[in-house]
């Protein structure tokens, strides 16, 4: 592993979406031990990112999580990579907008990334705090970002196969992607209630409409590669969202929908990068044992040391 001071200032930044409350899982799942020596999923994410050439990590968190993250997460690897924090709060809104009465739910991942704007320098990846993406995913995305001019609007996402990202214990939210013959994203459909169904899957929309899925569709697991040019467009999209939905108690502005809109407008392209890595995550408490077993198998096969941080 390299040290923080030896990493190039032009290395990509890893931005971690960690402000979620973990409502379905019933706890602060981002710092729940999963590895053989008490490692968290976040530990493996940072470990894989650092060995793929990422030079900084920015955690987007709620202000009341800061002490837990500094002591329970960042302290273990802050000597290896630069660590910073950005705070997502309900009242961080563009001029002219306010929080509606009774609103407690965060505004979503588009808002989270906007909250980290001042902490991001150069090209950056975005990941969920509670998803295990695998070594190859970081290598593929890190290589793409390292070779991308920071003024480019040719962005990327790592695509996983839908059937390999489902939970046996309930529904999941996935961005289901359609790509062209060259592997560029055409559309992305944020489906929020996907479950296994026969040999495939199905999603139930809010109005009760059921969408049949084969299970082979590429899906976004919120592993994205961007340049700072994203911010030229993101506040406009968030403003449009607030104008349409800002008075609602639970509506969210998802980054997959924002990217899909920009692709549709011709303002950007998004290459879907394929990976050999297996994805797994903890959506429900019952998923934890599966994740622990998967990590143990990777350690046994030499993908990771039994103790990540020495």
Spell out what each predicted region is:
Residues 31, 176-179, 272:
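A structural signal for short hydrophobic beta-strand segments in well-ordered beta-sheet cores
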Residues 218, 271-277:
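Catalytic beta-strand/loop signature of glycosyltransferases that borders the donor
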Residues 135-224, 228:
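Conserved core of the sugar-phosphate nucleotidyltransferase
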Residues 69-73, 141, 234, 291:
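Hydrophobic packing residues within well-ordered alpha-helices of enzyme cores
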Residues 234-268:
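A C-terminal functional module that forms or caps the active site or interfaces directly
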